[in-house]
């Protein structure tokens, strides 16, 4: 068993995006993995939680989770259902507020509710975590991100006016995110 944590990236509903910070970081962080994209039931919360569980089951040793957007909600939902020793930290970057309306092109609150995404769990996470929130994220207000961080027992970091930390917001690479992940290793 290895003692160096493995980084497991947990993408949001867009799954794998070539010019996303998670994709760039995965290439730079040796031995890291990414939860596999779903072939079917892409909006199913349960299917995504099970995909995370399968990815974790394939990793021997400690793990750092690096989640973005709805991936943060997958981590939180997973923690309600499963326990795994050795999760040494979780970066929850730009969590998506699945209880509030999202911009055009994203699922509606009703679609998300029907797919099991609501309500958002508000119990403390059983491992150390950090919510990194943008002051101008169109998918989650800064106030809501701060509220969720408190509920989850997460440290909270204001990363500035960086939108949703995705390609439409100008991210490709996100050096600060990579540094936050490395700090958990």
Describe each model-derived feature in a short phrase:
Residues 15-16, 135-140:
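Acidic catalytic loop of the alpha/beta-hydrolase fold
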